């Protein structure tokens, strides 16, 4: 098994890269998706979030009001740290369960937005960083996700710097390119990952 940490700044295109890797045959463990699952209605995770931030972060149907919570935590580093302390251990436990279920020769992609921020690089055999210029990130967040420029800049500022992400990268995937070129680059990276997965001693398993 080859454990790959995949990360990138918000708006860099990490989700597109993970989708393409899955098409090639990777096993994906998506931290964002798991983070939503562990705070679903009725979970201990959601109860802990409500205890920390109050019932104002709940939608009328009892689910987590993500935009409301986001507006609180991305404007206050201390509150973001509180949220991360609740969610990250739950995500880690579920991720380990999914990894254990994967085949012995699998390339397991851990899609982890905050890999650099939380010093998680040593957990993986190698780290792939999807990189885009800050201008590209901002454009995608405003144009494609409908964020205000202020909200987009706040979310970018809440993450690790571009330099910090690049410093932990074993492979950097430049995504200031059209989709067709990105698809070609992902194909090349996939071939490299499969080769590494079959090298004796490469995996931490």
From Swiss-Prot:
This protein's GO CC annotations? cytoplasm
**Entries under InterPro entries matching the protein:** Depp_CoAkinase, P-loop_NTPase
Give the record's pathway: Cofactor biosynthesis; coenzyme A biosynthesis; CoA from (R)-pantothenate: step 5/5
A GO biological process of this protein is: coenzyme A biosynthetic process
Query: Top EC class per UniProt?
Result: transferase
Query: Where do the DPCK domain residues begin and end?
Result: 3-204
- Give the EC number(s) under which this enzyme is classified: 2.7.1.24
Q: Does the keyword Kinase apply?
A: yes
Top-level taxon? Bacteria
Q: Which family does it belong to?
A: Belongs to the CoaE family.
Q: What is the name of this protein?
A: Dephospho-CoA kinase
């Amino acid at each position: 098994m080859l454990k790959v940490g995949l990360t990138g700044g918000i708006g860099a295109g990490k989700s597109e890269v993970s989708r393409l890797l899955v098409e090639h045959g990777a096993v994906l463990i998506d931290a964002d998706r798991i983070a939503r699952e562990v705070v679903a209605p009725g979970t201990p995770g959601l109860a802990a979030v409500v205890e920390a931030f109050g019932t104002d972060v709940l939608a009328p149907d009892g689910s987590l009001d993500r935009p409301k919570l986001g507006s609180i935590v991305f404007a206050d580093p201390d509150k973001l740290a509180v949220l991360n302390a609740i969610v990250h251990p739950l995500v880690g436990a579920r991720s380990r369960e999914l990894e254990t279920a994967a085949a012995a020769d699998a390339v397991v992609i851990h899609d982890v937005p905050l890999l650099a921020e939380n010093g998680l690089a040593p957990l993986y055999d190698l780290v792939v960083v999807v990189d885009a210029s800050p201008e590209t990130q901002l454009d995608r967040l405003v144009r494609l996700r409908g964020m205000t420029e202020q909200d987009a800049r706040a979310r970018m500022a809440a993450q690790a710097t571009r330099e910090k992400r690049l410093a932990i990268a074993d492979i950097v995937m430049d995504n200031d390119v059209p989709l067709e070129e990105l698809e070609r680059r992902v194909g090349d990276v996939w071939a490299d990952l499969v080769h590494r997965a079959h090298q004796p001693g490469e995996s931490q398993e």
